């Protein structure tokens, strides 16, 4: 049997870190040898997430205590906040340049330093790595991911919108200036740190929009849609927070270009993803339920005809912690390390 690859997870005490552990524990070709969580250093992973108590996992340590050169890690997942990430990875890759990285923060998703500074409020301090990073929407950039040392894992909202829209923009099948994305997220998308507005009594029985007109994922959507369309695209995007744990659900309104109908758009997407294991295009006119992807690495996409001539409604859904974060990160790892893309990710959605 081939020797297992040594894997580290930075920021293991958050939801995406825990999801990475869950997925990698059943991966036959890797071994988790490093888990960091500065505020939980010295604790066991099972102390932070009791579901991991039965498993033989390394003790949580602080990042500052890690000797990157001595660790000889094959790949690191970075689930740290933006700004912190660029400093940590600059140090890591200077001391262990052969280590590959999948970054789940926003630090390396945007290719223009000025755009990053505008949306995130500070200058980027690892510009060489920013230019090196490959955007990790696996189904679209698989060839680039395969050759990359540093992959910027896309955001959850952006993955859910880009998978249906990028193929249509590339095919010039829709008007690029008439895209409206109405998206909903589960509570885990807000992270694990304690916040008053995230208390059960504050979110239960309610539903609200946030970041209206200025959510940071708009910059990511604009960048990738502009590349696909071959011209500048400014998207209308409104996110909402819903009282469920997991899930992204996007309802997208588009106009067909040059007489393209909703059925034409459905055919384009069906052909695009017919061989992709983690994207399922429903029969025309059918729409997905977020429950049907929960806990899986799947994205379900539906296309329906609007009653307005020339317009179509696209509905896509994924699990924000899996395909929207850690699952896609493992998918990228598989491509980077030469494994089968589905390895460790082929479990179906939870039934309830």
Curated annotation (Swiss-Prot):
<keyword id="KW-0560">Oxidoreductase</keyword>
<dbReference type="GO" id="GO:0005737">
    <property type="term" value="C:cytoplasm"/>
</dbReference>
<dbReference type="GO" id="GO:0051287">
    <property type="term" value="F:NAD binding"/>
</dbReference>
<keyword id="KW-0028">Amino-acid biosynthesis</keyword>
<keyword id="KW-0521">NADP</keyword>
<dbReference type="GO" id="GO:0006526">
    <property type="term" value="P:L-arginine biosynthetic process"/>
</dbReference>
<dbReference type="Pfam" id="PF01118">
    <property type="entry name" value="Semialdhyde_dh"/>
</dbReference>
<dbReference type="GO" id="GO:0003942">
    <property type="term" value="F:N-acetyl-gamma-glutamyl-phosphate reductase activity"/>
</dbReference>
<dbReference type="InterPro" id="IPR036291">
    <property type="entry name" value="NAD(P)-bd_dom_sf"/>
</dbReference>
<keyword id="KW-0055">Arginine biosynthesis</keyword>
<comment type="similarity">
    <text>Belongs to the NAGSA dehydrogenase family. Type 1 subfamily.</text>
</comment>
<dbReference type="Pfam" id="PF22698">
    <property type="entry name" value="Semialdhyde_dhC_1"/>
</dbReference>
<protein>
    <recommendedName>
        <fullName>N-acetyl-gamma-glutamyl-phosphate reductase</fullName>
        <ecNumber>1.2.1.38</ecNumber>
    </recommendedName>
</protein>
<comment type="function">
    <text>Catalyzes the NADPH-dependent reduction of N-acetyl-5-glutamyl phosphate to yield N-acetyl-L-glutamate 5-semialdehyde.</text>
</comment>
<keyword id="KW-0963">Cytoplasm</keyword>
<dbReference type="InterPro" id="IPR000534">
    <property type="entry name" value="Semialdehyde_DH_NAD-bd"/>
</dbReference>
<dbReference type="InterPro" id="IPR023013">
    <property type="entry name" value="AGPR_AS"/>
</dbReference>
<feature type="active site">
    <location>
        <position position="156"/>
    </location>
</feature>
<comment type="pathway">
    <text>Amino-acid biosynthesis; L-arginine biosynthesis; N(2)-acetyl-L-ornithine from L-glutamate: step 3/4.</text>
</comment>
<dbReference type="InterPro" id="IPR050085">
    <property type="entry name" value="NAGSA_dehydrogenase"/>
</dbReference>
<dbReference type="GO" id="GO:0070401">
    <property type="term" value="F:NADP+ binding"/>
</dbReference>
<dbReference type="InterPro" id="IPR000706">
    <property type="entry name" value="AGPR_type-1"/>
</dbReference>
